[in-house]
Amino acid sequence: MELGQEATDDKRYVLVGRISGLYGVQGWLRVYSYTQPRNNILDYEPWYLQQNGAWQARRLRKGRVQGKGIVVALEGIDERDVAALWVGCEIAVHRDQLPPPQEGEYYWSDLIGLQVITLQGEVLGQVDRLLETGANDVLVVRGERERLLPFLMGMIVKQVDLQQGLLTVDWDPDF
């Protein structure tokens, strides 16, 4: 999973998933959920879907876990051809709907855009996006070049300062 490039700059919203495909012929959609557990995405409304750079609010008519994913029917999307236009769209919800992150936890959307510096104060770049790899999340940092840094609190990531917009890492800048 990738998160970041299409994320809204409006910090009032948090990306929680994306439309990943079609399901059936009546306009149902497959959803890849970024929430843990994955079915938590069904608890939030309205969804804000990004299509062609614009965000549109949509309400859930129905939704359920289906296999390893989620399938949903959204208001105003009743046909497969119409549903196909939404495949690939990001899903965001208003931040007020989500619980605040616990100590030492962060929403990915809060990390995107932070300046990344080493313990020695050398600037590596900015967090462009994050990747979910299974073993651990990975920060994609863009500066003079792109770097992939494991998001391991304490080992690699030493400090996250959202107020200052800084993420301090124990990382060799030549790596």
UniProtKB/Swiss-Prot annotation:
GO biological process terms on file: ribosomal small subunit biogenesis; rRNA processing
Disulfide bonds: none
Keyword terms of this UniProt record: Chaperone, Cytoplasm, Ribosome biogenesis, rRNA processing
One of the record's GO molecular function terms: ribosome binding
Subcellular location(s) per record: Cytoplasm
One Gene Ontology CC term in the entry: cytoplasm
Record domain PRC barrel: where: 103-175
InterPro entries per UniProt: PRC_barrel-like_sf (IPR011033), PRC_RimM (IPR056792), RimM (IPR011961), RimM_N (IPR002676), RimM_N_sf (IPR036976), Transl_B-barrel_sf (IPR009000)
Keyword rRNA processing: yes
Cited function: An accessory protein needed during the final step in the assembly of 30S ribosomal subunit, possibly for assembly of the head region. Essential for efficient processing of 16S rRNA. May be needed both before and after RbfA during the maturation of 16S rRNA. It has affinity for free ribosomal 30S subunits but not for 70S ribosomes.
Family: Belongs to the RimM family.
Domain notes from UniProt: The PRC barrel domain binds ribosomal protein uS19.
Quaternary assembly: Binds ribosomal protein uS19.
Protein name: Ribosome maturation factor RimM
Record organism: Nitrosococcus oceani (strain ATCC 19707 / BCRC 17464 / JCM 30415 / NCIMB 11848 / C-107)
Lineage, highest ranks first: Bacteria, Pseudomonadati, Pseudomonadota, Gammaproteobacteria, Chromatiales
